[in-house]
Structure formats: structure tokens, C-alpha cells
UniProtKB/Swiss-Prot annotation, chain A:
It comes from Caenorhabditis elegans. The gene is pbs-5. Keywords: Cytoplasm, Hydrolase, Nucleus, Protease, Proteasome, Threonine protease, Zymogen. The active site is at residue 65. This is Proteasome subunit pbs-5. Component of the 20S core proteasome complex involved in the proteolytic degradation of most intracellular proteins. This complex plays numerous essential roles within the cell by associating with different regulatory particles. Associated with two 19S regulatory particles, forms the 26S proteasome and thus participates in the ATP-dependent degradation of ubiquitinated proteins.
Curated annotation (Swiss-Prot), chain B:
GO terms for cellular component: cytosol; nucleus; proteasome core complex, beta-subunit complex. This is Proteasome subunit beta type-3. GO terms for biological process: proteasome-mediated ubiquitin-dependent protein catabolic process. It is found in: Cytoplasm; Nucleus.
Length: 284, 204
């Protein structure tokens, strides 16, 4: 079966029709069967009992995040414009920092990414499913999927599990035939298109910087610096966020992943820039 | 989230050869939000005795006032400086008086007695004293600290070694505890002087 092409059925029209049906069928909607709890036990109650804050650290899921993305147009012909996606890298369970180097920008295709906020496992698993769907779509339709379609598939999938305790807050961002686009998708089933967007425990802090300094037209350098700065300030105020800032720039032609930047280092540079004296002098 | 980790914060103390070190972080928060980064949790009681108060900082302030009040009365009555052993007993009594509605703070005492012997102790919210000879820690980073201190502590450390061990221990703790951090302050208490140093830490 594997490795067969249409050439193998060329001679017989009946076989050809059959082969087409078998090989170009639309993939079924991902309907997973997850292990079920015994009858009478509600999944949400079960999770609360065994995985909430009252449980040990190792039983809690990884959470706490700042992620942001925005669309901008090039200010000069020398700039590329597109989308900036910036995220922190901390995973925490309560006040315990379980990882300092999580990659929260997940690839969906060559031109699309999804960000990760909320339950880390939920995000990783479901974006993998979306990525699979997008790849199959591209093979079948011989054209890349739009951000709109991918995010809608994502949102519909999450909606199917609504009320069962999934925790996902993701931004699907990318470039397609319609241009640069960002869709915010969450586990409540919500999906909305935005130009400027931030998700996670530090999102309000990030919005503070973003709303203040965002312009629809920026140079590439300006835009990248804005993303970095918003993440840096969010990690400073929000104890759920920290580590390094991972940044992805999606231009009309390519997807550029920038090297991770230590947010603490960025903060000290920022304080230097201001000339603010940050040395603490205790007084008796 | 528990009230004990509402404001966050960590205090650690280590004993050396005729010297003690006591250190705290500088963060004060409201759950996940950092409010200020210049709040030390270590307070001077006498020249050679310091107290650290971790936990809910509103209660910690109140308790500190009560400690100072009792200590001042003691010194007036006895006309001599209070010893760390006596102070810890006093704080323990104070804490146990609130057995059925305790302050949400864990006190820690570090200092040198009149023979310059180091004394360190910590207690729970209702005054159960434990005074080991090596190191003590209280606050949201207690578990991380006890682990690293076990590795850094050596018998009879001199003041500079002791400072290094304490500073490295608290910095390691701040790497993993989200509720503490944003800088630290270390007090090295020796028989003739107290050395205060602020340490830069990660600001996230």
C-alpha cells in the first residue's frame, strides 16, 4: 500500500477511481479516544482533587506565561514588516519554577506559529494536531492553509472539549495570501482576529508597554525592540513569567527566529539607559 | 494561594566560627504581582542580634514592633543587651500567645551571644523553636534553601567564607522560587562589626 502512486492504476479505470477515493480522501476530524474515568466521576472534579494547589508540586501542571504578538507595516522601504511574536520562557507550578527554558513559540507550518499559554501539555498536544491537519491540508489542496482556517480548526477542536478542563490560550500567527494575521484562540472556544494581542498571567503588564509604544508603521528594529521590551517589563512585574525572551519575526518572505535574550540582562541594560540607581541601600 | 506565600519572601541564616550570616531577598508582592523590590526581611535588634521575619509581611511588621517592645522592656529592666537565646525564647512565647489565631509569619533569629558563640534558630508560626548548629531557613524558598545549604555549609567557616556560602545559597534559591527574588541583602555579623552587602540578582 505504502509507496503506491496513481501510475500503478493507470490501466484500469475502475481501479483508478477506487485509488482516488482511497488516496485523496479528506482526513477525518481528529477524534481521539482518551482514557475515560470510571462512571460517575466528573473529569473536572477529579482533576481538582488530585492536581490542584493542594496537591504536591509534581502533580500540578505547568503554567504562568507572558506571550504577545502584533502586526505592523514597514516604515521604510528597507524594512520588511510582518508579525512579531515574543514570549518568555518560564514554566511554574504555583511558586515553584519548574523550567527556565521553555520554547513557547510552536511551529505550525513554514509560515505559521502558535504561542503557548495555559496548560503546557494541552498547548503542545493540540498545536501538534493542528500542525498535522495543516500539513495534510497542504498536501491535499496543493496550496498552503490560511491562518484563518488553521485557527478555526484549532478553535473548533478546543470547543469540542469545552468544560472538560482543557487550559489553552494560544495565538496563531502567520502570513498567508491575505497578508499577516493573528488569531487568538482559547479553550473556552473563543477565536478572534487582532492586530495587537497578549496572553498569559503577565499579559496586562505587556499590554501596558504595547499600547503605549505600538504604531501601525514601524521599522523592523523598532518592532523587535518593542516586543522584547514588553516581555521584559512583564517578566519584571509578573512572578509567573521570566527566563529568556524568545522572539520570532514573520516577514512576507520568511520566518526568522531570533536568538534568546536573557530578560534579567535586558532589565539591567534598561535601568542603565534610564540612569536609574538601582542599588539597594538598607537603612537601620 | 496560601496566606504564607501571599507576599512571598525568604530568609536564611548560617553559623560560622565566631560569626553568623543572615540574608533575605528584597521582593514584596501581592500573589503573582511584584509590588516593591526594596523590602528586606532582616531587622536589627541589637548590635549582634538580628531577626528575620518571612511570611505575610503585614503580620511580620506587627510582630517586629511587638518584638522590639518586649526587647526594649527587657533591656531596661535588666540593664544589659539581650542574648540571641533569650530573644528567641521571647519571640517563641509571643508567638505561642497567639496559638489559636496565629500571626502568619515565621521568625528567625541569628546573632552572637556574650561569648561570641554563634546562635541561629527558626520557628514556625506558633513558636516551635529549632536551633540547629549549621543553618536555618524560612519563607517561600525554604525547601530550596535547605537543599543548597546542605552542600555549601562547612564546619567553622570564617566570615568571608560564610558570606560566600550564604550569598550563593540564597541566589540559588531565588533561581527556583518565583515568590522571592529581585535582589538580596546579606548581613555578616562578627564580634566587632557587621558587614552589610546587597547582591544583584535576576530581576524576573
Amino acid at each position: 500500500m505504502w509507496g503506491e502512486t496513481f501510475d500503478d492504476f493507470e490501466n484500469d479505470e475502475g481501479e483508478m477511481a477506487m485509488a482516488k477515493q482511497n488516496l485523496i480522501a479528506e482526513p477525518a476530524r481528529a477524534d481521539f479516544t482518551f482514557a475515560k474515568l470510571p462512571l460517575g466521576i466528573q473529569p473536572v472534579d477529579f482533576m481538582k482533587t488530585h492536581f490542584a494547589e493542594t496537591a504536591g508540586k509534581s502533580m500540578q501542571f505547568r503554567k504562568g506565561t507572558t506571550t504577545l504578538a502584533f502586526v505592523y507595516e514597514p516604515a521604510t522601504p528597507a524594512d520588511k514588516g510582518g508579525i512579531i511574536v515574543a514570549v518568555d520562557s518560564r514554566a511554574s507550578s504555583g511558586e515553584y519554577i519548574s523550567s527556565k527554558s521553555v520554547m513557547k513559540i510552536l511551529d505550525i507550518g513554514d509560515r505559521m506559529v502558535a504561542t503557548m499559554a495555559g496548560g503546557a501539555a494541552d498547548c503542545q498536544f493540540w498545536t501538534r494536531i493542528v500542525a498535522k491537519y495543516c500539513t495534510l491540508y497542504e498536501l491535499r489542496e496543493k496550496t498552503s492553509i490560511t491562518v484563518s482556517a488553521a485557527s478555526k480548526y484549532f478553535a473548533n477542536t478546543l470547543y469540542g472539549y469545552r468544560g472538560q478542563g482543557l487550559s489553552v490560550g494560544s495565538m496563531v500567527a502567520g502570513y498567508d495570501k491575505k497578508g499577516p494575521q493573528i488569531f487568538k484562540v482559547d479553550s473556552e472556544g473563543d477565536r478572534c482576529q487582532l492586530k495587537v494581542c497578549s496572553v498569559g498571567s503577565g499579559s496586562l503588564n505587556a499590554y501596558g508597554i504595547l499600547d503605549n509604544h505600538y504604531k501601525p508603521k514601524m521599522t523592523d528594529d523598532e518592532a523587535r525592540k518593542l516586543g522584547l521590551r514588553a516581555i521584559m517589563h512583564a517578566t519584571y512585574r509578573d512572578s509567573g513569567s521570566g527566563g529568556v525572551c524568545n522572539l520570532c519575526h514573520i516577514t512576507p518572505t520568511e520566518k526568522i527566529r531570533l536568538p534568546p535574550m536573557d530578560v534579567s540582562k535586558l532589565w539591567y541594560e534598561f535601568a542603565d539607559e534610564l540612569g536609574r540607581d538601582i542599588t539597594y541601600n538598607p537603612v537601620e | 494561594m496560601s496566606i504564607m506565600s501571599y507576599t512571598g519572601g525568604t530568609v536564611v541564616a548560617m553559623a560560622g566560627d565566631e560569626c553568623v550570616c543572615i540574608a533575605s531577598d528584597l521582593r514584596i508582592g501581592e500573589q503573582m504581582t511584584t509590588i516593591a523590590t526594596d523590602q528586606k526581611k532582616v531587622h536589627k535588634v541589637t548590635d549582634k542580634v538580628y531577626v528575620g521575619l518571612a511570611g505575610f509581611q503585614s503580620d511580620a511588621r506587627t510582630v517586629l514592633e511587638k518584638i522590639m517592645f518586649r526587647k526594649n522592656l527587657y533591656e531596661l529592666r535588666e540593664n544589659r543587651n539581650i542574648k540571641p537565646q533569650v530573644l528567641s525564647e521571647m519571640i517563641s512565647n509571643l508567638a505561642y500567645q497567639h496559638r489559636f489565631g496565629s500571626y502568619f509569619t515565621e521568625p528567625l533569629v541569628a546573632g552572637l551571644d556574650d561569648t561570641n558563640k554563634p546562635y541561629i534558630c527558626c520557628m514556625d508560626t506558633i513558636g516551635c523553636v529549632s536551633a540547629p548548629r549549621d543553618f536555618v531557613a524560612v519563607g517561600t524558598g525554604q525547601e530550596y534553601l535547605l537543599g543548597v545549604c546542605e552542600n555549601f555549609w562547612r564546619e567553622n567557616m570564617k566570615p568571608d567564607e560564610l558570606f560566600e556560602a550564604t550569598a550563593q545559597s540564597i541566589l540559588s534559591c531565588l533561581e527556583r522560587d518565583a515568590a522571592s527574588g529581585w535582589g538580596a541583602v546579606v548581613y555578616t555579623i562578627t564580634k566587632d562589626k557587621v558587614n552589610v552587602s546587597t547582591i544583584k540578582a535576576r530581576m524576573d
